[in-house]
Amino acid sequence: GVQTCALPILIRSLPTRRAVIGVATCDKGLPATMIALASMHNLPTILVPGGATLPPTFGEDAGKVQTIGARYANHELSLQEAAELGCRACASPGGGCQFLGTAGTSQVVAEALGLALPHSALAPSGQDVWLEISRQSARAVVELDNHGITTRDILTDKAIENAMVIHAAFGGSTK
């Protein structure tokens, strides 16, 4: 909430900034970061999506774990079992849910808008490929600055139309 609302103000308060990189993952933070970056019309911006959390090698994935409360209430799990399943649901640090919910959808839409590098959405969080995407994003925003390309040049009506078509094609979340 407050932290995200302040982002555009904080970005503008940095007199020497030449570009902005946003790093975000989840349901609320990623769309809010996209809005903040989109408001930086005269600056180059890029989003590094947080990727997807890897599923556990043992236990249940995040989608199934969301039902532990109901299963506990129905005496299908003990409190200890529920706690253990919850702790094992994520096999990598960071990242969004392991299903195409709001966080994953927002990552794909950010890429379709041109705010994120191609093939950066849903990269496995914390893995070498995600770290490489982060490095490439930093290089890309420097290149945008070197060529005078700003967010206004990227977020066009065509970019928004592209994002809508991509969203419809992959059937992303509409929450």
Which residues does each PLM region occupy?
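Short, small-residue-biased leader/transition segments that mark boundaries at the very start
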Residues: 1-7
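Generic hydrophobic alpha-helical segments
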Residues: 8-11, 141
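Mobile "lid/hinge" segments at catalytic clefts and subdomain interfaces of large enzymes
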Residues: 36-175
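A short, small-residue-rich loop immediately preceding and capping a beta-strand
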Residues: 11-33, 44-49
